[in-house]
Amino acid sequence: MGLPKEHRLKHWRDFKTIYSQGKRFRGDALAIILLPQPAAPTKIGISISRKVSKKAVVRNLIKRRIRHACRTLLPQIQPGWHIVIAVRYNARECEYEHFLQELKRLLIQAEVFHGH
């Protein structure tokens, strides 16, 4: 099960805008780029390069794990943000729990996580 439709970033223009104007935070396996969008619900997109893995099966597995972590954390993320999660090379060895912890840490660092 993926993210709810109203929380998905889909269009390449949105990704391009976020990459060019957003604020970046880096971790071991993930990087997040954030751009405030005050009148909109929080939307999340995932970007993964072939440099992470040549195999689509591996890339899709990583994306599914990250989407699950996003779905878990979504109720605690402040509304009004567009977020791109860029997967880094080290993500190949990571499990769901690692993605969940790292994503939470990056969101706290970016000050968009409720309660921190």
From Swiss-Prot:
GO terms for cellular component: ribonuclease P complex. Keywords: Endonuclease, Hydrolase, Nuclease, RNA-binding, tRNA processing. Coiled coil: none annotated. Pfam families: Ribonuclease_P. One of its GO terms (molecular function) is 3'-tRNA processing endoribonuclease activity. Disulfide bonds: none annotated. Gene3D superfamilies: 3.30.230.10. Its EC number is 3.1.26.5. It catalyses: Endonucleolytic cleavage of RNA, removing 5'-extranucleotides from tRNA precursor. GO terms for biological process: tRNA 5'-leader removal. RNaseP catalyzes the removal of the 5'-leader sequence from pre-tRNA to produce the mature 5'-terminus. It can also cleave other RNA substrates such as 4.5S RNA. The protein component plays an auxiliary but essential role in vivo by binding to the 5'-leader sequence and broadening the substrate specificity of the ribozyme. NCBIfam families: rnpA. HAMAP family: RNase_P (MF_00227). Belongs to the RnpA family. Consists of a catalytic RNA component (M1 or rnpB) and a protein subunit. This is Ribonuclease P protein component. It comes from Picosynechococcus sp. (strain ATCC 27264 / PCC 7002 / PR-6) (Agmenellum quadruplicatum).
